[in-house]
């Protein structure tokens, strides 16, 4: 999308004025996406889906290790149709994390996961943010997750209605939903 007003500045660079090719390069190298619908390539294994994304990035993480971090070490050779919805979601998360992006955009990343796995994934995302210095933007309708955030932006009807900073985020282990 093209901005209709204002500016978007990333790492000191105004990407509002960037060419389409520059935006493609920016997204490819610096942004990881976790989609609500997983968008896995059906004829590639879990490992190959993650490797595909990692190949386009200069400082990517090891695909196998990233899949292990999301609890899929024993499902590397499975195709998406052989995985449950939650497993497919974890492949999607691993694919985004393996790019080692500066910005990770996650749309309902725990939506298809059970409670325990959801907490593990939230912990992985928080660790990725804190330890690796990656900015993680978590988009969710689950208000119970808000206390874990460093910053919170609330939307209503497509408009920002509140922005706040959380000086002491709640550990994920203490969040219940």
Predicted segment positions?
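ABC family nucleotide-binding domain
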Residues: 1-155
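Conserved beta-strand-loop-alpha-helix hinge in the C-terminal portion
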Residues: 159-177
